[in-house]
Curated annotation (Swiss-Prot):
InterPro entries: NADH_UbQ_OxRdtase_chain4L/K, NUOK/Mnh_C1-like. Its EC number is 7.1.1.-. It comes from Persephonella marina (strain DSM 14350 / EX-H1). This is NADH-quinone oxidoreductase subunit K. The gene is nuoK. It catalyses: a quinone + NADH + 5 H(+)(in) = a quinol + NAD(+) + 4 H(+)(out). The keyword Transport applies. Its main location: membrane.
Length: 100
């Protein structure tokens, strides 16, 4: 059995990769995917601590986070599609105006 510390390290690495993806990327779709990666890192951390503490509450939180991530992805992709229809671009640097 793999020690839980490895899962915590993996979770931290995924969180850092997601944060780097949000900071470096300027495409809205890549930023949304980086956010999903960060949410999955939190899920891995919850399961790792759940494995260490022999408690099932971490798994319950994982299901809540998965449902929130699915709703966030649906709303985010809908907004990105609406922005693309109006501007023909999803680059963050070009989305500086509030007016159409």
């Amino acid at each position: 059995m793999v020690p839980y510390e490895y899962y915590v390290v993996l979770s931290g690495l995924l969180m850092v990769l997601g944060l780097i993806g949000i900071i470096i990327r300027k495409n809205l779709i890549a930023m949304l995917l980086s956010t999903e990666l960060m949410l999955n890192a939190v899920n891995i951390a919850f399961v790792a601590f759940d494995m260490k503490l022999y408690d099932v509450s971490g798994q319950v939180f994982v299901f809540f986070i998965l449902t929130i991530a699915a709703a966030e992805a649906a709303v985010g992709l809908g907004l990105i599609m609406a922005i693309y229809r109006l501007r023909k671009d999803v680059d963050v640097n070009t989305l500086t105006e509030l007016k159409l």
